[in-house]
Regions:
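Double-stranded RNA-binding/processing signature
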Residues: 1-118
Length: 118
């Protein structure tokens, strides 16, 4: 819950400050590339494959995965909630530098992959 809010704020802040988009509907549409459960799932898989996360962070991600969903793609939802849980945990523990490291990688990943076309 909190991690989702932190991510939403980081994305909106990034888009307002660093994109050339000016219209609100364009900013909202662009934000969907970052805040969708699919982008979270693909990004967390990238982090796991590249050993970007510490062992403790992987454990937090795994414990934070929500197993109940009414959505069709439960794996996507579980990975997304695990990623949001990790961000929320880091926020509550005042690990803001680590949040920014992960978010910088997230921006790079979204901007360099086909997630922008989803």
């Amino acid at each position: 819950y909190l991690g989702d809010s932190v991510l939403e704020l980081l994305v909106r802040d990034y888009l307002v400050k660093e994109s050339e988009l000016k219209k609100v509907n364009e900013l909202c549409q662009e934000a969907t590339h970052f805040v969708s459960s699919l982008s979270h799932e693909k990004f967390i898989l990238h982090l796991l494959e590249t050993d970007f996360l510490t062992e403790e962070e992987v454990g937090i991600f795994k414990r934070g995965r929500n197993t109940k969903t009414s959505k069709r793609d439960t794996k996507e939802h579980r990975y997304s909630t695990g990623f949001e849980c990790l961000i929320g945990h880091l926020y509550l523990n005042e690990c803001k530098d680590r949040i920014y490291e992960i978010f910088d990688e997230f921006k790079r990943y979204v901007n360099e992959t086909n997630l922008r076309q989803i």
